[in-house]
Amino acid sequence: MSGWADERGGEGDGRIYVGNLPTDVREKDLEDLFYKYGRIREIELKNRHGLVPFAFVRFEDPRDAEDAIYGRNGYDYGQCRLRVEFPRAYGGRGGWPRASRNGPPTRRSDFRVLVSGLPPSGSWQDLKDHMREAGDVCYADVQKDGMGMVEYLRKEDMEYALRKLDDTKFRSHEGETSYIRVYPERGTSYGCSRSRSGSRGRDSPYQSRGSPHYFSPFRPY
């Protein structure tokens, strides 16, 4: 039995509502659906006879709840299309401002790194999951040419990412892997710039630094 006293909670406590679930859904199924977005603190499944099941999932980090909404709202699960949202209307009392349903969260920072060499199936959620090894990521975005951008809450986390996550193995949610490059945005002076691949264009921080090499389990290598 869950200890949640109020099912109406909000974005500040890391809780999300999951509706339109299949009738045979289990808590383990919900864990499998949402574990990639962050550490789950609690799952409460409401499966009452004659009613469409729904659930509440609480993440330890409220920002992971935001990611889960963007990643799973409208997701086709079996014969059902999931409805994933905060238990009440977004109130603006902390957390990320809401962007479009399929876009990244819009909280921004000046502690920014660029990433190249992402595999075609790499999403902004995958990029955030990989780069959060260096610290708290407040924004992540991915372009179609294998480029990405990540912003950290703290300067020291950004600097750690430049030192430790450059030339590391990245894996997408579809299993594609590649070795990515991580470097500072042009014009910054964080002491970690690299020149191995030549200069980047003045106007486009997403200009490629060379052809990425990636492996897909679904196509010949």
Curated annotation (Swiss-Prot):
Keywords: Isopeptide bond, mRNA processing, mRNA splicing, Nucleus, Phosphoprotein, Repeat, Repressor, RNA-binding, Ubl conjugation. The modification Phosphoserine is found at S189, S193, S195, S204, S208, S211, S216. Its main location: nucleus. GO terms for cellular component: nuclear speck. SMART domains: RRM. There is a cross-link at K36 (Glycyl lysine isopeptide (Lys-Gly) (interchain with G-Cter in SUMO2)). It comes from the Eukaryota. The keyword Nucleus applies. Residues 187-198 have a biased composition (Low complexity). The modification Phosphotyrosine is found at Y214. Extensively phosphorylated on serine residues in the RS domain. Residues 14-89, 111-187 form the RRM domain. GO terms for molecular function: protein domain specific binding; RNA binding. Residues 187-221 are annotated as: Disordered. Residues 188-200 are annotated as: Interaction with SAFB1. InterPro entries: Nucleotide-bd_a/b_plait_sf, RBD_domain_sf, RRM_dom, RRT5_SRSF_SR, SRSF9_RRM1, SRSF9_RRM2. PROSITE patterns: RRM. It is found in: Nucleus. One of its GO terms (biological process) is response to alkaloid. Pfam families: RRM_1. Belongs to the splicing factor SR family. Interacts with KHDRBS3. Interacts with HABP4. Interacts with NOL3/ARC/NOP30. Interacts with NSEP1/YB-1/YB1. Interacts with SAFB/SAFB1. Interacts with SRSF6/SFRS6. Interacts with TRA2B/SFRS10. Interacts with C1QBP. May also interact with DUSP11/PIR1. Plays a role in constitutive splicing and can modulate the selection of alternative splice sites. Represses the splicing of MAPT/Tau exon 10. This is Serine/arginine-rich splicing factor 9. It comes from Rattus norvegicus (Rat). The lineage of its organism: Eukaryota, Metazoa, Chordata, Craniata, Vertebrata.
